[in-house]
């Protein structure tokens, strides 16, 4: 495994990544569900914002609210900032930090493809995986959800999305006060392999949220959410049991010949 210090300059691959992030919309099928679970005045934390695909969806849903897009990686953040500017997302604030269980400095590992370009979608904190032939690394700042809420003096937090390659449980540990106080809805990408690399286990993430009164759901065809009984890899929506959305029919309502999403 080759480990290199982070160094970046504009290249053809950067322009390709930027063009893709600017002109394409991933996760389009989730837009109706996000619109139902993220009110127009919502405050949203998009953690691991990457190149802004979810950020764009949240910005449209919370068009009278505020989206905080957390992205510690310099390469991804340079794309994210440009996407936010080009799309005129004035309700988005890009935050150059990672979120975890405590405030500190850590190492962000960015896989390098055989072409030499960054596999920045798989960037993660901590030790590099042996599956990669070469990686770049940079030092980044880590803080907590609770710390950000206190610093910004937020009086609400409606939604947290986190896709941070195994650090999701660490994020939850740093958000305990916020989860209890604001009961935000969550969208988490959970991988047993990635969580193990971070020193955690998949079942622990589900148990942590269940103990705090959250119910797990999974997106299914037809833009509906189905309850989940057991821990597994995938993208999961966690909704507080007392939240009406946890017991509502979350399938989109169709009227006459109105087109679907």
What residue ranges belong to the model's regions?
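Phosphate/nucleotide-binding beta-alpha loop and adjacent structural elements of enzyme active sites
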Residues: 1-261
